[in-house]
Amino acid sequence: MLYGRERFYMTGNIVIFVTDQRQSNLAACLPGKIHRLDWRRGVEKEEALEVLDNSKYLVLPVPVTKIERNHDVNFILKEELTGKKERDWILFGGVFGPEWRQRCEDAGTEYYDMMTDAVVVHRNACITAEATVAEILKYSDYSIRGQKIIVSGYGRCGKEIARVLSAMGAKVTVLARSAEARRLARTEGHEAVDFSYGPEEAYGARTVVNTVPALVIREPMIREMHSDAVIIDIASRPGGTDLMAAETYGIKVVAALGLPGLYTTKSSAKVLADAILEHSKIRQDGKEAKTWIYQIAI
């Protein structure tokens, strides 16, 4: 029988599926009593259903597809969402793909994609920028101050990364397709050019940070890089770098995915927790918590 089931059954219990340190820290940011479970080596369906039957809020990873790494959990969730039993769940997660969105909509299950929240995206970008600095210092042989650094893309993360690097004394050049993005980058004090000038700008740069989830760091640009240059690619898979060209020319590429789940993970968890509390009725009333948080390692 579940821990605390009789006492807390109708109070909106929470399930957090833990795939990284950020998810692990998330429980401490939410009101409730924490009970830890470990399903990494498999889970009995009866136990899983008992947890799910007693929960209102399911917090999936960022991105949501990380749940698919655990076959048992992924299968049970899919089965329950598409089954005949009506589920009064609210799902939280980041980057719900078309399949997950369709599954929730077909089941009439409410879901909230935290990575569509402007506040979450901005705070996440700030953390990502700091983490990117850590990655540069870890993999580059050069200090940031005085270094020419190329930032590929000028979206939320690109803007924040360029701002932080510039504040640290880097000579930042932004690559952006949009004329408006280039204009904005220049108003912030950066050099800014179209991607067609990438090869020319690559000469003399020792670090390239890519934020674009499309193939933009191509062979002509990689060919011009110095042998000790490094590419920090933070874009979602498959990234934006021609890996074969990088291997051919001996250029180091670091696939720096999910940085908020690796760095400053308590701050990163607080960002998600604030969004969950903002879009739910989870609250701690009185001196004693009335909610159980099932923190499940998968």
Give the ranges of each region predicted by the language model:
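Glycine/serine-rich phosphate-binding loop and adjoining beta1-alpha1 elements at the start
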Residues: 59-145, 265, 275, 282
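Glycine-rich adenosine-cofactor-binding loop
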Residues: 14-25, 145-165
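Rossmann-like adenosine-cofactor binding region
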Residues: 63-70, 76-91, 188-261
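Phosphate-coordination loops involved in phosphoryl transfer and adenosine-cofactor binding
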Residues: 11-13, 88, 145-148, 228
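NAD(P)-binding Rossmann-fold cofactor-contacting core
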Residues: 33-44, 170-188
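Conserved S-adenosyl-L-methionine
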Residues: 167-171, 251
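Rossmann-fold NAD(P)-binding glycine/threonine-rich loop
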Residues: 95-112, 235-279
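Residues in the short beta-alpha loop(s) of Rossmann-like NAD(P)-binding domains
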Residues: 20, 40, 97, 177-178, ...
